[in-house]
Amino acid sequence: MYKTPSRILLTCVLVLAGTVLAIAATPSNEPPVAQGVILDFGGYDIYYQAIDDPGNDPVESLVELCDYYSMTAVWDGASLVSVTKEQETYPEAGNASVWKLYLNDKGSIGWKACTDDPKSIRIGDYAAVCWGLCEGRDLPTPGVDATGVCFYGYGQSYRIVSLAPSCTETICATGAGNIIVGADEFSNYPAYIASKLSTGEIVSVGGYTNPSYETVAKLNPDIVIGVGDQSVHRSVMEKLRAHGVNCLAMFPGDSIKTILDNTYMVGAAMNYQLKSTQTIEQIEDALNAIDAALSAGQSRTSKVMISLSTSKSPWVAGGTTYASDVINRALCENIYSQETGWVMVNSETVPSRDPDYIIVVSSDYGNTDRDYEDMVSSLSAEWRSTTAFSNGNIYLLTEGATDLASRPSTRIAQFTELMCRMVQHGILDDAELPMHIGDDYRDYLTITKELGFET
């Protein structure tokens, strides 16, 4: 027996009375199991069908999904050959993608292709189950969050708590900013979030690294969204889940693709999937426009360093960061691409790797010529011996530009355009760029100027 499905299933919303602590729920350490089947056409075109019986197999579940959405599935035994929806058949003629069954084991993160007979699979034995249209070794959009919990079927959200600025920006970009009831104290974008935090209309739930579980619980949220690589976020969400509160842990922002996946996940978990896919399309279109501009111009492969300070031994963007991905998108090379994550590096490596451009991301300075001059004059001998210093190619991103560059959020296209303007001189020259950029960063954007998702 199947529950009534929808694009993202609308289930009965649990009305929370009093505090969340009073909800009758039994805490469990058992890994959550799949409650339905996912159909992923690629490009974030995804459908979900909830089931009541975890013993159902993926074949019968997909048949039910296709019946509900007036789709037609063509099978060769238990192998899915094609799916037709809205008079279009997938895969299209000449497309190398094929339908496969993908499974996400309980207690783990990541799809694996099923090599067994799909009819022998019990959906309830896995955290998530997906029929995905993929090419080669490509995988479907993640079906679980950063804690291995499937985020489909949560139902409509009406009260949201965000535990991080990047989460807040993503929630707002997917159209749900008006129902945020709690946020971390550093969430300041869009501007209306900062205003509501200052008046108490949105309750501060603490800092990024020390959110208050009690404060979050008292807000009776439908869903709490945090960052999966923050142990304190995971701890808070684990307690909330034990009391019946839906939670989503976003993946660390290690690439542009991960940011887009997070955007989809947030929208799907809140039942704002349509808006989230529209947001993703806008970001992708802008990134493609930037790519086209770079391809049409005389791009150069320069060496770039992104630093979080002017310290002699600074913290820099390593290879597994969205910032490094942005450098690559600008057709340049991150001199610390062999490092992992954001990492403190030895001072001697700065001159030895000799960056052509240095981008300092720091709110320790103001956005004036004097502040910039003070920053440059304070640089160590190691920094002064670089090509970037000799050629006057050291940029300062401060004030609002610091947030833009330091948050893996839906403003990633704006950061990418700004990066290209800094490191690809002569290509995007329709706006004159100063050496220090702050709250005025939008003044230097043309392709992505309206992609701040401020409303």
Model segments located where?
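A short, structured surface patch at a secondary-structure boundary
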Residues: R159-L219, I223-H233, I335
